[in-house]
């Protein structure tokens, strides 16, 4: 994954703000800091893992203990304290006897006020099927967002009631984003069940550059 993101940097892309949504223990942010060390980071995680305390006193990193959604409401939360925790129950045996907790959700629109100084946002969402609801609650951020990295289903259904691959593509198109790159394939029992896909804002200059480069001799 990070080799693909590093190529973005080599092409001249540098975000002002990176949102790590579904931060878990913060390992994704740690790897991103090796690429973009100076930008602002905001980490969102439903569980207050002690592993995230390493970011407590870093000026350009802010943590949020929140379950993100498209509205503020109480929802059933399926929790085993691992990467499968979600409002959409994982369909593996690991969650056969999981704890069901009532949690109150929040939205990015409610939690964040983006200052004028922030012009370029990179969003990563890995939330076990909640990607579309989270983006529905983030409409105020999208005009300044260049790239959105999502984990989306491809074949089969890993979580209950999650939109399909095609529904994700159509939704992203409806909010002004198209596929840019595939950074990872997640094979389970030799089936390619999930993809990590970077979507690009349709108005980003790379949409013009890609075709201009085709014409160069």
Indicate residue ranges for each PLM-predicted region:
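Phosphate/nucleotide-binding beta-alpha loop and adjacent structural elements of enzyme active sites
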Residues: 1-217
């Amino acid at each position: 994954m990070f080799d693909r993101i590093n190529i973005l940097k080599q092409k001249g892309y540098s975000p002002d703000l990176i949102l790590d949504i579904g931060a878990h223990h913060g390992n994704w942010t740690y790897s991103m800091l090796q690429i973009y060390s100076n930008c602002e980071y905001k980490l969102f995680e439903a569980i207050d893992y002690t592993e995230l305390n390493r970011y407590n006193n870093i000026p350009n990193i802010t943590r949020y203990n929140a379950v993100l959604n498209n509205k503020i409401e109480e929802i059933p939360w399926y929790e085993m304290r691992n990467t499968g925790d979600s409002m959409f129950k994982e369909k593996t045996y690991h969650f056969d006897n999981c704890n069901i907790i009532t949690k109150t959700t929040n939205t990015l629109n409610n939690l964040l006020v983006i200052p004028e100084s922030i012009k370029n946002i990179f969003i990563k969402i890995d939330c076990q099927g909640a990607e579309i609801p989270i983006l529905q609650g983030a409409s105020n951020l999208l005009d300044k967002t260049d790239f959105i990295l999502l984990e989306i289903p491809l074949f089969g259904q890993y979580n209950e009631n999650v939109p399909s691959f095609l529904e994700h593509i159509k939704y992203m198109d409806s909010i002004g984003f198209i596929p840019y790159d595939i950074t990872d394939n997640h094979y389970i029992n030799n089936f390619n069940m999930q993809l990590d896909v970077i979507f690009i804002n349709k108005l980003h200059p790379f949409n013009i550059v890609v075709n201009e480069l085709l014409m160069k001799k």
